[in-house]
């Protein structure tokens, strides 16, 4: 049973002052209350850190990770947060979305017989006005390593997973073709149980700073082929390492 199990929610921030408070408030308002929000800022030049400090003072569940590692980029920022996580269950959150108040509660109902679950989302514009009813329908979300190498449908903001997967996920390869969520999804498909659930549990906000997270079609065919080759190469390398270490 997962009732009252602690969850670490990981947030990597960078110049996110515009929507940050709205996202954090939606987490604070969750019906499931056994969570910690771990945040690491990646060198913001706006008021992001001021906002985070205020929330950290107001809610003991919110913890800002401070270190001297400087700007790591989004993937390594999330990786650092993964290394700092101590709870049995982990979620990613973006700095600009809005969670439905029962997002965690509903996802925890599904996690018992899976290791990674991924929910649907409602896609909105920057003002939270409806653009698409379903993220699944836009990106054709479904299981499969090859399918998701061709077009990634693993979105970190829609994930809940068990900490046990980190044994094989970490470290995340240092390559711009490999996002933290794509890597978590691919490794989980190989070694663990992954389930897509038909629940729309957040408002996925699209704005000028994140539009490419759904549509990368402007890349050339050559660039796409090279990118997928790099992903396959890194996967094969990790599979060999895991086989050598675990004989699996």
Indicate residue ranges for each PLM-predicted region:
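Cell-envelope/extracellular polymer assembly enzymes that use nucleotide-activated donors
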Residues: 5-8, 36, 183
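Short, well-formed alpha-helical segments that are part of the catalytic scaffolds
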Residues: 16-29
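Conserved short acidic donor-positioning loop in nucleotide-sugar-dependent glycosyltransferases
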Residues: 27, 42-43, 68-69
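A conserved acidic beta->alpha catalytic loop
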Residues: 41-50
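Glycine-rich, basic loop-to-helix element that forms the pyrophosphate-binding segment
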Residues: 67-85
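Conserved nucleotide-sugar donor-binding catalytic segment
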Residues: 83, 143-215
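Short aromatic/hydrophobic "clamp" motif used to bind/position activated sugar donors
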Residues: 90
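Conserved donor NDP-sugar-binding/catalytic core segment of glycosyltransferases
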Residues: 102-131
